[in-house]
Amino acid sequence: MKILLVEDNNILAKGLIYSLEQKQYNVVHKLNIQETINYLIYNRPSLIILDISLPDGNGFELYTQKIKPQKIPTIFLTAKDDEDDIVKGLELGADDYITKP
């Protein structure tokens, strides 16, 4: 299973990648929206773990415009334990959410 991790915090990303690879998942890491869009042109991951807040834009918009139409399962990743963001992500169609430690 190939997982695309979209996260701009390298320390957090390294921890997530390590944990997922220990479970035998193949993880591809992208730092921002543009890298993610470029990757999705030629690749289709089995799952996307997507940060809501990225340096070049909003994860919700990326999901709505580029990911949801491809029907790729997505889990939002958020630093904020903000119920509004969680509800918004789930209402948009995300499969789940994770709050950052």
For each feature predicted by the language model, list its residue ranges.
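N-terminal/domain-start alpha-helical segments
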Residues: M1-P101
